[in-house]
Amino acid sequence: MALIPATVHQLAGKAQSLLAEKSVRAQIASSSRELDQADAVLFFAEGPGQFYQLDVWIETFHRLAAAGLKTGVIAMDARSARLVLENSSLPVLFSHSIEHIETRLRAIGARAICYVNNSQRNFTMLRFNGPAHVHLNHGESEKASMVSHQLKAYDYACVAGPAAVERIADSISRFDLAALVQIGRPQLDGLKPAEPSSTTRVLYAPTWEGDSAAMAYSSLPDYGERILAQLDADPNFEVRFRPHPKTGDASPAAKKAAAALKSAYSHLLDPVHDPGQSLVWADVAICDISAMAYDAVALNVPLILAGDRESRLRSGLPSAQLLGRANGLADRVAQLAASGVSGRQKQLSQYFFATTEPGAATKKLGDLLRSF
């Protein structure tokens, strides 16, 4: 019976996409945003519910375009195409016909197609011979999804650093490690420094509940209330709450918990669009095993890690930086903010990221895409 609501939701999404097509095509034409030349394109077949996966790459591709690489976006859902138009200046090719997309890419001479997730619909595009197929993913973490056997389908997979190479080598049998390119995290290159503050700024950014037991990393249902209540009660803290955009998609209980927290702590909801910019703002970040935690490491933001699953990140951090049951959290946050990034966290940065030098990751990605 659980499949019925999901099926209805999918059908409703398809109907909404069809209804949006005419206006989106008109918007592309009126704004002269049609993709008519490109060296490298971002491919995205999903609807707006997964748009965050593409969104984290848009600014990077703007920077690559400014450096002379012709870039653009292919969207197979009209609603996602509209979001690209509204949130970027990149040219767009909207079509739900793979044959049409292949014809257009062949005509404009695209040399690389980049993928931001593990969507099954990527495989409709992967049949296209000629351009290099490059998997980018949308974040670095030790979630189970980061070692998908699907990686073998791509010509190259960009990874953050040595940890990802080690993880893939250990987890995916018969994988050609020569296909892995360590680039760091280009999404973090364009971030702006935060203005100084007299208070301690704390970001709580839990991940979503995942679509399987293996992906259930969220602290929100069990600890969200305890975390936010302690932090909000302390006048020395300025707190922002940033739940993952997919929270509640796979679990009614998680959806109910998230709705309750958003209502009770609406004054804490993070107003910032870019998740990396939210981390730059923070003096301390409280995160689950997710890209937010690893980006905090890359950005030298003192991290308190939630969850008790074994990971290299968890075992590498001092015990004081493990959330546990969130007891005495206010004092622990204050102490961590005062002491700054621990030496062990700094060592983890070198392990997880090939580079954290500003601009270097974007250059590494640009060099790869130009090489085709």
Model-derived regions, located:
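A donor-sugar binding/catalytic signature common to diverse glycosyltransferases
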Residues: 135, 272-314
